[in-house]
């Protein structure tokens, strides 16, 4: 079959392990979703900063794509204690 070609109407993308996510009930490669996006609101995992991910509740780390022409990154949950501590300290200072 075609990678990322499956439907995600009733179940999530099976191809998430190869970097695919659901958009408009069809699975697409994450970088394709990001490249074709008009705004960050086009997909819940699109971001331009770590704060975007935290605000959306979809992670705490915005990872850019290697292709510099793609203006949006992809949200992930970073489990590093150092990362979480750094953010906590930053928020403590600014609030």
UniProtKB/Swiss-Prot annotation:
Which InterPro entries does the protein's record reference? Albumin_I_a (IPR032000), Cyclotide (IPR005535), Cyclotide_bracelet_CS (IPR012323), Cyclotide_sf (IPR036146)
The record, for PROSITE patterns, names: CYCLOTIDE, CYCLOTIDE_BRACELET
* Sequence intervals crossing the membrane: none
Q: Name one Pfam family in it.
A: Albumin_I_a
Q: Tell me, what is an example of a GO biological process annotation in this record?
A: defense response
> Any S-S bridges, and between which cysteines?
4-20, 8-22, 13-27
| PTM per Swiss-Prot/TrEMBL | Contains 3 disulfide bonds. This is a cyclic peptide.
Cyclopeptide (Gly-Asn) cross-link, renumbered residues: 1-30
Q: Which domain of life is it from?
A: Eukaryota
Expression (tissue specificity): Expressed in stem, shoot, root, leaf, pod and nodule but not in flower and seed (at protein level).
Q: Which residues form the propeptide?
A: 31-95
Entry keywords, A to Z: Disulfide bond, Knottin, Plant defense
Q: Which family does it belong to?
A: Belongs to the cyclotide family. Bracelet subfamily.
Q: What exactly does this protein do?
A: Probably participates in a plant defense mechanism.
Query: Anything noted about its domains?
Result: The presence of a 'disulfide through disulfide knot' structurally defines this protein as a knottin.
Q: Report the protein name in the record.
A: Cliotide T5
């Amino acid at each position: 079959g075609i990678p990322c070609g499956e439907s995600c109407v009733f179940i999530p993308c099976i191809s998430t392990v190869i970097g695919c996510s659901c958009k408009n009930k069809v699975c697409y490669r994450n970088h394709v979703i990001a490249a074709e996006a008009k705004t960050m609101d086009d997909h819940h995992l699109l971001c331009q900063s770590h704060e975007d991910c935290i605000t959306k509740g979809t992670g705490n780390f915005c990872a850019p794509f290697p292709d510099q022409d793609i203006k949006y990154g992809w949200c992930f949950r970073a489990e590093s204690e150092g990362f979480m501590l750094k953010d906590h300290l930053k928020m403590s200072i600014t609030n």
